[in-house]
Amino acid sequence: MAEEFGSIDLLGDEDFFFDFDPSIVIDSLPAEDFLQSSPDSWIGEIENQLMNDENHQEESFVELDQQSVSDFIADLLVDYPTSDSGSVDLAADKVLTVDSPAAADDSGKENSDLVVEKKSNDSGSEIHDDDDEEGDDDAVAKKRRRRVRNRDAAVRSRERKKEYVQDLEKKSKYLERECLRLGRMLECFVAENQSLRYCLQKGNGNNTTMMSKQESAVLLLESLLLGSLLWLLGVNFICLFPYMSHTKCCLLRPEPEKLVLNGLGSSSKPSYTGVSRRCKGSRPRMKYQILTLAA
């Protein structure tokens, strides 16, 4: 009777109507039950059930197994979507309250535990999702920062490269100008060297002519000096020797006269002529010897 009473109470719930087995009410009771049981007995049992106290009621009710209740709730959660979880929970709560207060307390605890577990799981999943999102955000931020750093480094490297190229261009231009300047200076030095060499060669030619002129002048002076010396010697010789020659002539003149006087003129003439010729020929020889000694 208690089971039938519980089934009738369950039929009163509209939310739990589709989960209830209607065969209990629809199936007709056998005739033997109707014959054996009278309406008075039924009424008496109902009055006894209503008049008894709570302890007797707890003993009379069939205790539900916690495992069966948890299996039933799990089946409900599996069969129905999450949107109907509230209605299923309400239906389960109603069933437990109808059956027994202790079972209701146990089922309430289990439901609260399940709800807490669900909330914890949901919160854990949300935290995990948040962590994943934060990790993704951190990875994206790191990538962005890395890209920004790479861009900045690339810009700085390009600027340094441009500055280095500009410095090299300036140095190359400066070196080109220096090369041109040094080339011009070298050309000037070469031209100056050639001109100096030409001047030296020209000066050497002038020196040779001057040397030849000087030599000729020296020779001329020497010849003049020699000539003057010879003239002086000649003058001295002429001034000194006429007296001697005159004395010699005076000494030799009386002999031919004497010979002529003695009648020997024919024999004396050749000797006189010879003496005179000898004296005439000796004078230029003496002059020549004096000149050679003076030179």
UniProtKB/Swiss-Prot annotation:
SUPFAM superfamilies: Leucine zipper domain. Residues 142-162 are annotated as: Basic motif. It holds the Pfam family bZIP_2. Gene3D superfamilies: 1.20.5.170. One of its GO terms (molecular function) is DNA-binding transcription factor activity. Keywords: DNA-binding, Endoplasmic reticulum, Immunity, Membrane, Nucleus, Transcription, Transcription regulation, Transmembrane, Transmembrane helix. Interacts with BZIP28. The C-terminal transmembrane domain is cleaved in response to ER stress and the N-terminal fragment containing the bZIP domain is sufficient for transcription activation. This is bZIP transcription factor 60. It comes from Arabidopsis thaliana.
